[in-house]
Amino acid sequence: MQNDNKNTLMFIVSAFAILIGYQFFVLGPQQKKAEAEFRAKKAAEQQSAAKAGVTLDANGNPAPLRLSRDAAKALSPRIEVDTPALSGSIALKGARIDDLFLRKYDETTKKDSPPVELFRPEGAEHAWFADFGWAGANLPGLPDSRTVWTAAPGQVLRPNSPVTLTYDNGLGLTFTRVIAVDDQAMFTVTDSVKNNGTNGLQLAPYATVQRQGISDALGKNQIVHEGAIGVLGATDEQKLEMAKYGKWKKDKPLQSFDSVGGWTGITDKYWLAALIPGQNQAIKAQYRVTNVAGIDVYDVNFLGPVQVLNPGATVSQTTRLFAGAKTVPLLRKYEYGATPAPAIWEFWNKTKAEIPRFDDAVDWGMFRFFTRPIFNILEVFYKLVGNFGLAILLLTVVLKLVLYPMADKSYESMAKMKKIAPEVEKLKAKHKDDPAKQQQEMMALYQKEKINPMMGCLPMLIQIPVFYALYKVLTVTIEMRHAPFFGWIQDLSAPDPTTMFNLFGLIPWDPGSLPLIGAMIAHLGVWPLLYGFTMWLTTAMNPPAGDPIQQKIFQWFPVIFTFTLSGFAVGLVIYWCWSNVLTIFQQYIIMRRYKVENPIDQIIARLRGKTAGAT
């Protein structure tokens, strides 16, 4: 019995040693070879694609290929993609997903606007596509971007109607690719390889999302992340890994990550192309920027583990591709799959996500804990009223009610300070040569009247995080894009389209075309002017600043902020304007309670006086 135990123990130790040794001395080097082969293969394909069919410039260097979109599409036979959310095609050359339009989103708010373009074929300017395949050390005949796959005629990719592509390399390997799509934005790509030969092989699956050049506008917005993005790392240590276009190219052109599952891709402000491997699969992900024939190529890819393919056997790999708009409900639907997603306030809920932190594809910013709840509240209000502009007004009212006790004390303090302003001026005149005595007497007066002079700053300090959160939400969430309000406001995420400098559109002239000042006056429309008036009224209802220079500065604040905010999203201007109106109403009630003279009563008195005079 004792010998049996010893033998069993020796067997376990030996088996474990063999397993570790095989992993270290065989599979490890094979994985590295496969990885090197994959990187070399992709680099060679980029060089070949960039140089194929191009002319030379004056220096003898290859000039970048600049085909029209239709001409680039015509370089390959195609299979149509037709879903409720997507239209486009798959190239049989390379079996790439490289031609997609988003049916539910238009480029502009005009009625005849074309749909948003997501993917564009290689060869056209600013190409963007997804690629899949296999890499292996010293294996000839693996399909690449130039391989033309075979498909049965008449196939169309639709929900519940996948397409099948095949390729026989003539060297004993048969490759099959089955591409399926749902009715929203998720592709499922299943690759399989059958070994019809007599020798065993080692293969590693890969997937990549690549952009060949970007427009000048991308990556310039400091508020929004655009570039590489992913949630990568060990299962319990996954982090959001981001690389903005500019910094990615300049500071970190090559970044590598070891991960188990997760996801990675390339994002714009509103659109995302993300690769999602099996969540139990160990992968090596990479963010890479190279320059090929003058074009910056942005590449996000992952390489899966080496798989042994014995004679007569088949190996397979399934990768998902999200290609669409970053709508938060859709991202959370994919994040949790069939499991109901926990509510955002259920921080105690430990429901495991199928795609970890997928809704972080939306750039909530460093104050996610505040920005995200603001969006959720707006979304709830939108479902109630059916308009995001009204939802913003409703959110403002709710915030005012929540903060009412604190704000009430602040406005009460401000009203009292305005009431004793004449006494403060007398103290300043009396002790103008003794600042210490002046300060002492003023503090005594404040104590007597039970006034805290610092309370006046509280309303503004409270609004700062709300302002930031709403600004972020209006900037990064696609739900706000092209969201109308009323009248001329058709996009809450864009500045007011009118300006007083062309009489709000009556004169056919664009003030934005003026040099230097055009950007400042191009959107000085109705809502920014309403905001300026409400800010002036709010300032007038506050107690005057103690210092004359400060008084002059505060008088100019409404003008300065009117010009500044005119270039912001009009939804933000509407929020601030409505917030000012509610503040004025609250202050007016408090000032009437304490019988303090206020500008509203002065305006009403003047209007009555003029009316009486006219009568």
Swiss-Prot record:
The chain crosses the membrane at residues 9-29, 384-404, 458-478, 516-536, 556-576. Keywords: Cell inner membrane, Cell membrane, Chaperone, Membrane, Protein transport, Transmembrane, Transmembrane helix, Transport. It is a multi-pass membrane protein. Its main location: membrane. One of its GO terms (molecular function) is membrane insertase activity. One of its GO terms (biological process) is protein insertion into membrane. It is found in: Cell inner membrane. One of its GO terms (cellular component) is plasma membrane. Pfam families: 60KD_IMP, YidC_periplas. Required for the insertion and/or proper folding and/or complex formation of integral membrane proteins into the membrane. Involved in integration of membrane proteins that insert both dependently and independently of the Sec translocase complex, as well as at least some lipoproteins. Aids folding of multispanning membrane proteins. Interacts with the Sec translocase complex via SecD. Specifically interacts with transmembrane segments of nascent integral membrane proteins during membrane integration. HAMAP family: YidC_type1. Belongs to the OXA1/ALB3/YidC family. Type 1 subfamily. This is Membrane protein insertase YidC. It comes from Caulobacter vibrioides (strain NA1000 / CB15N). The gene is yidC.
